[in-house]
Amino acid sequence: IIQIKNVTKTFIGKDNQVEALKGISLDINKGDIYGIIGMSGAGKSTLVRCLNYLEKPTTGTVVVEDQDLSTLTEAELRKVRTGIAMIFQHFNLLMQRSVLDNVCFPMEIVGVKKQAARKRAMELLEIVGLKEKADAYPSQLSGGQKQRVAIARALANTPKILLCDEATSALDPTTTKEILKLLQDINKQYGITIVIITHEMAVVQEICSHVAIIDAGELAEHGTVEEVFSRPQS
């Protein structure tokens, strides 16, 4: 579903240039839970932003569902992006909107009628186990609950791919386990391909089928989780 071919990304500053990614090639298959692991500053978040072309690679190609993103117009890219949802470390919820309205928000943007959006939002809140919090506000929720709302919101427009950028790193170990279990269930039930960006080995071991290790902008290793962790070269 995602092919990354020889992607490099160079950021040019006033006095220097930083090569954030150096010739990365990866295939992520439909239905995978794919972990991308590395220390902070290794280039993981840059890579994930290249996957939906929020960052354009300096060289190389990104192919999503047989479409080379570099050949698409801005309007076509927007269409592809509706199939790629994202959740973040800090949840990025709208604080002045209720939980229900947060989940409705992406549907409003694409013009879903209010009644249909609310119905779908309630179904999603049920999936993430927060139906009873529909009228609450983000400030009244725990970290784990906020991330559940963010997951419900990410699923609103039925994406095919879910990108998780350090989605559990602000959570305690028990809550992390619960969120990972939820992601696993969503992957199984809806066949959504999940890409998990993390610096935590335990997260990858818990739910990923495949893993890539990024080190200083380079692909140090990749393969199934069993392969990579049983013969660590890096």
What do the PLM-derived regions correspond to, one by one?
Residues 222-223:
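ABC ATPase "signature
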Residues 137-141, 145:
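Conserved ABC ATPase signature
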Residues 52:
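Helix-to-loop junction immediately C-terminal to a conserved catalytic motif
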Residues 67-68, 104, 108, 115-132:
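Conserved ABC ATPase "signature" region
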Residues 204-206:
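A short, surface-exposed alpha-helical micro-motif characterized by mixed small hydrophobic
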Residues 156-160:
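A short, proline-enriched helix->beta-strand linker immediately N-terminal to the Walker B motif
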